């Protein structure tokens, strides 16, 4: 009944998520920014909006500037970067989303962003994650969707909280929910949903908490999991 993504509602909403809802004729809620924003696919109705506090975002951006990190700022339906570089080009190639380069203005934004995405070299990833958590303890929640992506959200914001909020809105119990994922930012859903499903190419820690593992995403794992549940072809362990 809903679509959950870590990316934003700008180009992703128009190119990757909304077309499926339109094709099916369903005004389903679209969960984006790791749960920070939930909007109706067709109506645009806002169910959840939990951006980072502006001062927290500005402090994070100053940290990014001082440490020479690459950052992406998700604000409204736009994605902003300081300048185009290998990271922005890589992200555009993977996601199909073209960022808007705004130079030094990125460090002095005037609007609270939905999410910040910090990219590092893989070998610096763990150390950077730890440093951000220590310096901004209690002010930001950190997760990741790839080995060099640090995703920074308002405390308490995650995919499960967004799904849970929607479920309560529709009168659905947690045990009646199935969530499918592959990365660290999916763990909150996998752990708490009645049926947490990991695709075969999911991170080991995601598979560890999943109640079932389906085929990889390249082998229609999501479709197979849904079909199996709907046709009661599997027994979900307690």
Predicted regions and their residues:
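Mg2+-dependent phosphoryl-transfer enzymes with acidic/Ser/Thr/Gly-rich catalytic loops
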Residues: 151-238
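Short, well-ordered alpha-helix to beta-strand connector turns
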Residues: 9, 27, 113-114, 193, ...
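Short, hinge-like loop/turn segments at secondary-structure boundaries
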Residues: 23-27, 47-50, 87-92, 159-161, ...
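Metal-dependent catalytic neighborhoods of phosphoester/phosphodiester hydrolases
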Residues: 15-24
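Single conserved hydrophobic/aromatic residue that forms the stacking wall/gate
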Residues: 2-13
